[in-house]
Amino acid sequence: WIMGHMVNAIAQIDEFVNLGANSIETDVSFDSSANPEYTYHGVPCDCGGTCTKWEHFNEFLKGLRKATTPGDSKYHEKLVLVVFDLKTGSLYDNQASDAGKKLAKSLLQNYWNNGNNGGRAYIVLSIPNLAHYKLITGFKEALTSEGHPELMDKVGYDFSGNDDIGDVANAYKKAGVTGHVWQSDGITNCLLRGLDRVRKAVANRDSSSGYINKVYYWTVDKRQSTRDALDAGVDGIMTNYPDVIADVLNESAYKAKFRIASYDDNPWETFKN
């Protein structure tokens, strides 16, 4: 999965997919009542990234729905996964469940079209703080009470705080999560980060007792760091330059081993070689 980073304006969806992304990451900010409000990152952000683009969250969802609904004039067949980077740092811990409920209702109405031929992309809820695990339970409760528990089949999870792998496993246990787990690891592209924790995550993914289904690394903009991440065995790379990742995947060393994921590749299944 080539994951376009900080795609917060509807116009950027076309831009990133046309550069080779089959997945996008979108920032979601919340108001003081835990309503998802804007798709907005804000400063500071990555070196060379554009961090001031934004939309109202529900408007962004409508644009995203068009981009992922077959038959729509804006449809991109390649766009199969969306990571919502949930900026829950502005919330009190006891608001996490409410944030999850409100997020689910927004998605149900504006993205899934109330379960009636809505957008088809898989969705990852990426949460920066393990203490906010109730966002997941609130999300699930809301979809169930709205009569659409089947949409949870399209939803996966990520804790993005680079926490100890054992602590992450524990948070999932508390949230009642037993699958659909992506594990991110990374740092802003302005800084260097080793691949030690990525290797631990990959080892967990590949062990029979692990909780992780997919591992992605962020934010990678250079060819050599792309090669290093692929050599470590990641499933996804988040980038400001999807074309760079696509180029490296075309190199002979990687062409035989990796391919770009399509809609038929289940993002919740661990890839077995």
Swiss-Prot record:
Cofactor annotation: Mg(2+)
Disulfide bonds: C45-C51, C47-C190
Subcellular location: Secreted
Residues of the active site: H5, H41
Keywords carried by this UniProt record: Cytolysis, Dermonecrotic toxin, Disulfide bond, Glycoprotein, Hemolysis, Lipid degradation, Lipid metabolism, Lyase, Magnesium, Metal-binding, Secreted, Toxin
Positions bound to Mg(2+): E25, D27, D85
Main location: secreted
SUPFAM superfamilies documented for this protein: PLC-like phosphodiesterases
Reactions mediated catalytically: an N-(acyl)-sphingosylphosphocholine = an N-(acyl)-sphingosyl-1,3-cyclic phosphate + choline; an N-(acyl)-sphingosylphosphoethanolamine = an N-(acyl)-sphingosyl-1,3-cyclic phosphate + ethanolamine; a 1-acyl-sn-glycero-3-phosphocholine = a 1-acyl-sn-glycero-2,3-cyclic phosphate + choline; a 1-acyl-sn-glycero-3-phosphoethanolamine = a 1-acyl-sn-glycero-2,3-cyclic phosphate + ethanolamine
EC number: 4.6.1.-
InterPro entries: PLC-like_Pdiesterase_TIM-brl
GO BP term (any one): lipid catabolic process
Glycosylation sites: N250
Expressing tissues: Expressed by the venom gland.
GO molecular function: lyase activity; metal ion binding; phosphoric diester hydrolase activity; toxin activity
The keyword Secreted is annotated on this UniProt entry: yes
Function: Dermonecrotic toxins cleave the phosphodiester linkage between the phosphate and headgroup of certain phospholipids (sphingolipid and lysolipid substrates), forming an alcohol (often choline) and a cyclic phosphate. This toxin acts on sphingomyelin (SM). It may also act on ceramide phosphoethanolamine (CPE), lysophosphatidylcholine (LPC) and lysophosphatidylethanolamine (LPE), but not on lysophosphatidylserine (LPS), and lysophosphatidylglycerol (LPG). It acts by transphosphatidylation, releasing exclusively cyclic phosphate products as second products.
Similarity-based family: Belongs to the arthropod phospholipase D family. Class II subfamily.
Designated name of the protein: Dermonecrotic toxin LapSicTox-alphaIB1ai
Lineage: Eukaryota, Metazoa, Ecdysozoa, Arthropoda, Chelicerata
